[in-house]
Amino acid sequence: MLRVAINGFGRIGRNVLRAVYESGKRDRIQVVAVNELAKPDAMAHLLQYDTSHGRFGKKISHDQQHIYVHHQNGEYDSIRILHLSEIPLLPWRDLGVDLVLDCTGVYGCQEDGQQHIDAGAKLVLFSHPGASDLDNTIIYGVNHETLTAEHKIVSNGSCTTNCIVPIIKVLDDAFGIDSGTITTIHSSMNDQQVIDAYHNDLRRTRAASQSIIPVDTKLHKGIERIFPKFSNKFEAISVRVPTVNVTAMDLSVTIKSNVKVNDVNQTIVNASQCTLRGIVDYTEAPLVSIDFNHDPHSAIVDGTQTRVSNGQLVKMLVWCDNEWGFANRMLDTALAMQATQ
């Protein structure tokens, strides 16, 4: 049993906890503690009721020191609530924590991870790309087999790298990629404003519900971290759109082979049924973004939108639930880290 603590109980932290139960991994993962500065009643309420993902299928209750996840047989899981703002104060040793899922979005370098380990955790997994000094960055399904026992402090990448990197790998393995560009069409996030208000990024001073808003992205750097051979070969831009969840990615790549649309799509289908089963999915149904809400895959390719120009310029539309898919990959990576120890 992997004993897990969640540091940061925001969008990803709460989705990770739900995913432990909804993905059927509760028999392998036990969440023993959550560290969050918010009040226990708000933590429990937002775990039970979620605007994007609906009501949690488990009954949730709480007191000032615990969240309780109730099972139908009358038993319940008790999760310790902590409200500590500094990592060295966290009682991971006393709680017997094996692995910390750091979902704060604040911490992400080797020193931060080492503080978790010094506090008693054995392993640390960050929920964002993190610094280059981490032991490894894992995009599950692509490079998780590179994990070793020496990799104690790891990043799970970002939701967008988890979406696009598996597709890049499939295309490169099959056809060879020369270069590419990506446009991320991302749902609004909590670093945006409800109405116009001050922000360091002037575009993010504007109301999230009223505009399509360009934002900076380092997605191309995330691709290079996983595939060093693509250094300076990919560029990316990102826009935020007035939806609360689900992201679309417009991928264009130049390839070394001459292909047709069916060649590209069939390659994705094959991967989704074999090497990337559960990670990549494929559809030709006439779906829209809401239809991918709460989808656990990292990437879903809409085959009806695949285009090929002059045999070697390939354009694809790839969907992901940027919260739920990523939360499920956090758990997959956590178990993969445990398996190396």
From Swiss-Prot:
Positions bound to NAD(+): 11-12, 322
Keyword Transcription recorded: no
List GO terms (cellular component aspect).
cytosol
Subcellular location field: Cytoplasm
Coiled-coil annotation reads none
Site residues (Activates thiol group during catalysis), renumbered to this chain:
186
Q: Output the CDD domains linked to this UniProt entry.
A: GAPDH_C_E4PDH
Pfam families according to UniProt = Gp_dh_C (PF02800), Gp_dh_N (PF00044)
Q: What is its EC number?
A: 1.2.1.72
Name the catalytic site residues: 159
Q: Which UniProt keywords apply?
A: Cytoplasm, NAD, Oxidoreductase, Pyridoxine biosynthesis
Reaction catalysed by this enzyme: D-erythrose 4-phosphate + NAD(+) + H2O = 4-phospho-D-erythronate + NADH + 2 H(+)
Q: For binding substrate, which residues are annotated in this chain's numbering? A: 158-160, 204, 217-218, 240
Q: Do you know which SMART domains this protein is assigned to?
A: Gp_dh_N
Biological or metabolic pathway of the protein? Cofactor biosynthesis; pyridoxine 5'-phosphate biosynthesis; pyridoxine 5'-phosphate from D-erythrose 4-phosphate: step 1/5
| Superkingdom as given in the UniProt entry | Bacteria
* GO terms of molecular function: erythrose-4-phosphate dehydrogenase activity; glyceraldehyde-3-phosphate dehydrogenase (NAD+) (phosphorylating) activity; NAD binding
Q: What the protein does?
A: Catalyzes the NAD-dependent conversion of D-erythrose 4-phosphate to 4-phosphoerythronate.
Q: How does it assemble?
A: Homotetramer.
Q: Which family does it belong to?
A: Belongs to the glyceraldehyde-3-phosphate dehydrogenase family. Epd subfamily.
Q: What is the designated name of this protein?
A: D-erythrose-4-phosphate dehydrogenase
Record organism: Vibrio cholerae serotype O1 (strain ATCC 39315 / El Tor Inaba N16961)
